[in-house]
Design a protein with these regions (language model features):
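Long, terminal "pre-/pro-" and other extracytoplasmic accessory regions
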Residues: 2-101
Length: 101
């Protein structure tokens, strides 16, 4: 294979890898194997609840025995963040709380 072909193949393969999220992400490997709802689906559910919001952070955690995604969402022009908990098993919104800093 020529050098040019190798470089072109590497560029195509590199382009196929997903980009890293633009937010802080704490997702322990020990918990990821237990989820039934994908991170992408849970993110879409949380963002529908906070229109115009931007994800600042995600934490996959067990809280009170429930496995959940905890999303910190910032809305431009609004102080603080909105925290949305989405069940990692059902996709149901468990709670929404605005935390004004």
């Amino acid at each position: 294979m020529s050098t040019f072909a190798s470089i072109a193949l590497a560029a195509v393969l590199g382009a196929q890898q997903p980009a890293a999220p633009a937010y802080k992400r704490e997702v322990p490997d020990s918990l990821i194997a237990k989820v039934r709802v994908s991170e992408d689906s849970a993110r879409a559910i949380a963002l529908r609840r906070v229109p115009g919001g931007t994800i600042e952070a995600l934490e996959l955690e067990r809280e009170g025995g429930t496995l959940l995604y905890s999303w910190d969402i910032k809305v431009r022009g609004k102080p603080g963040i909105t925290e949305v908990h989405v069940s990692a098993r059902t996709g149901r919104i468990l709670s929404v709380e605005h935390e004004a800093n």
